[in-house]
C-alpha cells in the first residue's frame, strides 16, 4: 500500500481553503449577465470557451493533493446543484466559497466547528422556507421564456425557443437538444407517438415522391411474436378487408411467406397494409407494445395472456387517425385510446421513473412518457463554428433544465435578490449558544455573495449595490445588464425557486463538512530517486556491441 501523508487541524483546512478559492474564483467569473468567459484547454482539438460554471469546475484538478481535496469538494457542490435542478452551479459555488472562508475565520478564532455547522444548518432551513414563501407559480409562456433567457446568459433566442417548445408539447413533453446544421436555432415538433422502426418492405410505400407509407384511419394489429405463417393471419386480414380500412401490423418481426403475402395483397389493392417491427428489445419491447395498445385502444396479441392470431377479431385492434411510415421511423397520430387509460399508464411510468436508480432506464422511461403525453420537440442549435456550437448547446441544456425547475417549484426574483429578501428569516434567528449564532452570521454573510459577485462582474461596487437592494422591498433589485434598479419580475429577471434552493442546500452541506474537517489524508508524493534506481546499468548495455 502506498505511503500516506496526513495533515491535521488548521494546516489541513488552510490547504483545502486554497483549493476551494482557486476553483471558486475560476467559476464565479462566469456569474451574471456580464460574466466573463473561461477558456479550457483540450488534450486534442481547439480549446473550448464557456460561460457554464459546471463545465469550468469539471476541468479543474490541482497539483497539490490537499489543495485538490478542497477543489474537488466545491466541484461536488456544483455537481449536486446541477443534478438536482440542472442549473445554479455558479451560484452554489459562490455560496460555498463564502461559507468556507467566513466559517474558517471563525474556527481560527476558536469557535467550535460543530456548533458553527449547526448554526449554518439552522439558518439554511429558515432561508429555504422563506424562499418557498417568496415563490410564485410559473405557468405562462412569457415567464418560461424569461427564465430560459436568464439561464442562457441573457440570450433571448434560447428563452423564446424553449417557451415555444413547451407550449407545443406541454410541460411534461420531451424536449431534446441536438446540434443543428445552420446558423440559427430551429425547433421541430413531432406530434403523436414516434418510434425508430421503419416499414419492413419498400413495397408498402404509397407516396413514392416522399417514399413514405401513409395510412388514414388505420386499424392497428399488435403482436408480441414473430409472424412467418400467413394462415394464422387470414381471419384478421379478411375481417379488415371487409371493414375497408387500412391495417398497420406491429410485431416482433414479419418474415417469409407472411411478408410476401402482405406485399402482394397490398400491391393488388385487396388490403391496404403495412408492417413494422416493434420498437425496443426484450422487456422494453413488451412495455412499448403495451404503450401503443393503450394509445390506440387496442390489445397486444400475446400467448402469455391466452390470445392467438387465429382468434383475433376487429375488437382486439387499435386504431388511429393517421399512421406514417418512413424508411427509419413510424408515427402514429391521434390514437383512439381512452384518455383515462392513457393517464393511468402515464402515472404508472412516472412511478417507475421515481423508483429507478439507473440513468439509462430513467431516460428510456421519460422517452416513453413523452410519446404517450403528446409529442417530442427537438431544438436544433445553430452556430458559426464547432467551438461556439458546444458552448451554445451547453447553455441551451442549462436553460431547459432551469425552465423545467421553474414549472415544477415556481420562480423568485432573480439576480441574487431572492436570497437578500430571504435574509429577513434569519435576521433575528438565534442559535442555542454563541458559536451557533456565529454560524447563523456566516450564512447571513454568504447569502449576499451571489449579488456581490454579479455586481463585481459588471464592474460595479458590490457593497453599494447590496446596500441599495437591501433598502428596497419585494422584487426591487439590480439589473446588472443595464445598470438599473427596479422590479426584477417586471424586468423579466427570474430564477427558478428550485435552482436557488438547491444551490444553497448543496453549498451549506459541503461548506459545513469542510469546516468540521480535522484531518486530511492523501498519498505521499513519490521520491524522484526511487524511479531512477535501475538507470545506471542501462549505460553498460551500450558497450555490449564492442564485447562481441
Curated annotation (Swiss-Prot):
Which domain of life does this protein belong to?
Bacteria
Pfam families membership: Cpn60_TCP1
Subcellular location per UniProt equals: Cytoplasm
The reaction(s) catalysed by this protein are:
ATP + H2O + a folded polypeptide = ADP + phosphate + an unfolded polypeptide
Q: What class of enzyme is it?
A: isomerase
Q: Which PROSITE patterns match?
A: CHAPERONINS_CPN60
Q: Which GO terms describe its cellular component?
A: cytoplasm
Q: Does the keyword Disulfide bond apply?
A: no
Going by the UniProt record, its keywords in alphabetical order are:
ATP-binding, Chaperone, Cytoplasm, Isomerase, Nucleotide-binding
Keyword Iron-sulfur tagged:
no
Q: Where does ATP bind?
A: 30-33, 51, 87-91, 415, 479-481, 495
Any idea which GO molecular function terms this record carries?
ATP binding; ATP-dependent protein folding chaperone; isomerase activity; unfolded protein binding
An example GO BP is: protein refolding
Give the enzyme's EC designation: 5.6.1.7
Reported function: Together with its co-chaperonin GroES, plays an essential role in assisting protein folding. The GroEL-GroES system forms a nano-cage that allows encapsulation of the non-native substrate proteins and provides a physical environment optimized to promote and accelerate protein folding.
The entry's family comment says:
Belongs to the chaperonin (HSP60) family.
> Which proteins does it associate with, and in what oligomeric form?
Forms a cylinder of 14 subunits composed of two heptameric rings stacked back-to-back. Interacts with the co-chaperonin GroES.
Q: What is this protein called?
A: Chaperonin GroEL
Which species is this UniProt entry from? Pseudomonas fluorescens (strain Pf0-1)
Amino acid at each position: 500500500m502506498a505511503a500516506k501523508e496526513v495533515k491535521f487541524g488548521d494546516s489541513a483546512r488552510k490547504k483545502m481553503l486554497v483549493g476551494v478559492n482557486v476553483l471558486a474564483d475560476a467559476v464565479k467569473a462566469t456569474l451574471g449577465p456580464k460574466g466573463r468567459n473561461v477558456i479550457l484547454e483540450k488534450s486534442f482539438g481547439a480549446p473550448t470557451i464557456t460561460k457554464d460554471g459546471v463545465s469550468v469546475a469539471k476541468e479543474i484538478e490541482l497539483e497539490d493533493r490537499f489543495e485538490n481535496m478542497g477543489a474537488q469538494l466545491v466541484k461536488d457542490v456544483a455537481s449536486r446543484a446541477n443534478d438536482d435542478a440542472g442549473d445554479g452551479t455558479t451560484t452554489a459555488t459562490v455560496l460555498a466559497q463564502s461559507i468556507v472562508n467566513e466559517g474558517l475565520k471563525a474556527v481560527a478564532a476558536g469557535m467550535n466547528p460543530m456548533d458553527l455547522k449547526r448554526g449554518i444548518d439552522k439558518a439554511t432551513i429558515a432561508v429555504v422556507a422563506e424562499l418557498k414563501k417568496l415563490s410564485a407559480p410559473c405557468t405562462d409562456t412569457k415567464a418560461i421564456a424569461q427564465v430560459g433567457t436568464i439561464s442562457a446568459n441573457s440570450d433571448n433566442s434560447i428563452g423564446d425557443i424553449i417557451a415555444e417548445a413547451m407550449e407545443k408539447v406541454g410541460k411534461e413533453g420531451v424536449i431534446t437538444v441536438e446540434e443543428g446544421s445552420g446558423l440559427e436555432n430551429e425547433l421541430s415538433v413531432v406530434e403523436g407517438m414516434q418510434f425508430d422502426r421503419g416499414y419492413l418492405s419498400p413495397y408498402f410505400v404509397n407516396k413514392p415522391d416522399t417514399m413514405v407509407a401513409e395510412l388514414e384511419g388505420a386499424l392497428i394489429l399488435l403482436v408480441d411474436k414473430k409472424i412467418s405463417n400467413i394462415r394464422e393471419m387470414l381471419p384478421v386480414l379478411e375481417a379488415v378487408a371487409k371493414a375497408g380500412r387500412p391495417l398497420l401490423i406491429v410485431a416482433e418481426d414479419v418474415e417469409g411467406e407472411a411478408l410476401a403475402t402482405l406485399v402482394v395483397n397490398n400491391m393488388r389493392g385487396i388490403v391496404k397494409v403495412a408492417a413494422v417491427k416493434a420498437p425496443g428489445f426484450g422487456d422494453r419491447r413488451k412495455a412499448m407494445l403495451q404503450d401503443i395498445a393503450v394509445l390506440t385502444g387496442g390489445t397486444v396479441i400475446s400467448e402469455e395472456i391466452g390470445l392467438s392470431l387465429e382468434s383475433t377479431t376487429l375488437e382486439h385492434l387499435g386504431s388511429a387517425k393517421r399512421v406514417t411510415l418512413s424508411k427509419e421511423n413510424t408515427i402514429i397520430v391521434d390514437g383512439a385510446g381512452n384518455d383515462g387509460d392513457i393517464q393511468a399508464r402515464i402515472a404508472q411510468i412516472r412511478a417507475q421513473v421515481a423508483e429507478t436508480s439507473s440513468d439509462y432506464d430513467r431516460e428510456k422511461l421519460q422517452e416513453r412518457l413523452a410519446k404517450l403525453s403528446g409529442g417530442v420537440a427537438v431544438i436544433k442549435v445553430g452556430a458559426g463554428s464547432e467551438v461556439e456550437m458546444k458552448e451554445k448547446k451547453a447553455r441551451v441544456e442549462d436553460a431547459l433544465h432551469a425552465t423545467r425547475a421553474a414549472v415544477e417549484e415556481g420562480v423568485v426574483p432573480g439576480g441574487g435578490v431572492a436570497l437578500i429578501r430571504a435574509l429577513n428569516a434569519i435576521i433575528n434567528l438565534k442559535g442555542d449558544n454563541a458559536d451557533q449564532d456565529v454560524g447563523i452570521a456566516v450564512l447571513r454573510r454568504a447569502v449576499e455573495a451571489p449579488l456581490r459577485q454579479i455586481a463585481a462582474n459588471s464592474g460595479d461596487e458590490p457593497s453599494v449595490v447590496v446596500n441599495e437592494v437591501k433598502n428596497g422591498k419585494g422584487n426591487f433589485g439590480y439589473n446588472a445588464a443595464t445598470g438599473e434598479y427596479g422590479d426584477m419580475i417586471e424586468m423579466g429577471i427570474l430564477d427558478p425557486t428550485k435552482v436557488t434552493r438547491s444551490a444553497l442546500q448543496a453549498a451549506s452541506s459541503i461548506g459545513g463538512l469542510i469546516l468540521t474537517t480535522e484531518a486530511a489524508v492523501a498519498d505521499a508524493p513519490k521520491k524522484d530517486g526511487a524511479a531512477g534506481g535501475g538507470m545506471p546499468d542501462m549505460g553498460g548495455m551500450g558497450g555490449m556491441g564492442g564485447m562481441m
